[in-house]
Amino acid sequence: MKEAIPGAGLHTVLRSLVATLPTPDRWKVGIYVALSLASALAGALAAILLVPLVQPDARLPFEGRWFHASMSMGWRTTAFTGVTLAFALLRWQASCLGARLVGRYGMRLRRQVHARLIAAEIGPLAASSAEIANVLTYNVEIVVQGFSALQQLLVAGVTAMVSLSLAFWVSPPLLLVAPPLAVLALLASRFYGREQIEVGHRYVADMTRLFWHSEDFPRRLRHVRSFGREDVERGSYGEVSSDLARGYARQLELIASGRLILELLAVGGIALLFVLAQRWHGIDQGALIAVCLLLGRLLPYLVSTRQSVQQMRSAAPAFELWQRYMHLPTSHAPPAATARPAIPDAGIHLRRIHVAPPIPGIELGDLVLRPGELVLVQGDSGIGKSSLVDVLAGMARPVVFDACVGGHAIDYDAYRAYVHHGAYVSQSVRPWQATVRDCLRWAAPSGTDGQFREVLREVGLDKHLDTALHDASSRLSGGELQRLLLAQVILREPAVAVLDEATGALDAASELAVLSAMKRRLPRSLLIVVSHREGVGALADRCVTVGPAIRSIVPSHAGA
């Protein structure tokens, strides 16, 4: 797939949009164009058949055996009605097919970018959560509008080609006005093009800022209220909303301005057509009416074409953002289920690991990870604990990795195979399922209600399985949500469980009780716990301390 160039021209966006279509849908686009062509032919023919109904003495260019001047008005009306019905049915069929294509296109874009994010390396995603939310939601809508505009451009192009061809067939002299008008229309289509792209870029950026204001709103609201900054928050949100309003209004103004230019050109063209007909002797009145009807059919398409071009330009920055996330580096594919070895009792000996960032990095050496043990990772905030545990969880590749199992050296991909069946719970993650049962079944699809109740007792959560997680009357506290997520870990029975400050909402005694229960219930699991509380060291088999002065980590045996 080709990567879109920021600020690229309309032809580049068109090429990139088409490149995202799979082959079956390209064939369906071809069918859509064919239906549009048939619809345009039927519509143009209906316009010509209207002439003898308006002026009975007019002669049609295709008069012959099946249609001639001596036909009764009833037959002429029947022919016009039949062709008009065919036009309506063909246009309806094309519209239905186009709607299905647009729907599938949006679905595919969302699935593709979501799948790419699921497979992406953790590092590049750390500081862009609001932008990611935008990419997964509204941004795709803008791109889909661009794809729908592309369909409308195809219809307009086919209709214009058919109408102009038939008009030339009916009366070639009258079409002398077409070339200069076409040149003027082409020039008009370029008006405001650069500004439209700039407005589109700003609109996408402002929408991302709006997502920042909306992200995790309850926690944000507590923070704002505690600092007494409600007025500042309202002002900041209002500023973003105003920028969005101005951007949206400017987009509509640009569309309206372009439409006005095209309508003025159309009025001038029709007036010029009548002047030409009066001055050019020998032009049949019926031919003049037919040409006017054929060209009149193009007026709404001229207006919609301008709007479609503007929508395509607005979609360009949104499509560039989508493609930027589609080019994120991905982590290596997880090993097959049959290729996941169990961590041996002797453990995995990590002889040397270098993690960066943070700069200058973290150096870890001589640490053994054994099943059934609890490794405590401590250190000041922001010093790199999460970066280290990302590596230990197999989610982020280190700069240097030197390890062995049973005396045999392994690389990081082999290490990932050992720890792939894992569980990772961080402090900020919140369950998105509807009920307690749904949350537990997500972690253990084959689990029973009895198993779910038992594991809830183990973590000290006294809640019914049907308790709603997001209902105002039954919302769980922060500590209860953490207990629920830890229950997921027990049901998972992972090879490695990483708890990155996942017990911070519990008091010290509850934290020790829950961790003790997890260690008891998971005798074959390695627990890696990040915590600021010194008391957790009493449960730890090994402690890793990230020092504030030098970023060299020396694991020490707990209690040593």
Question: Model segments located where?
Answer:
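Juxtamembrane loop-to-helix connectors within ABC transporter transmembrane domains
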Residues: 118-162
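Membrane-integrated ABC transporters
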Residues: 1-46, 61-77, 94-98, 102, ...
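Cytosolic ends of transmembrane helices, especially the final helix of ABC transmembrane type-1 domains
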Residues: 229, 253, 298-328, 334
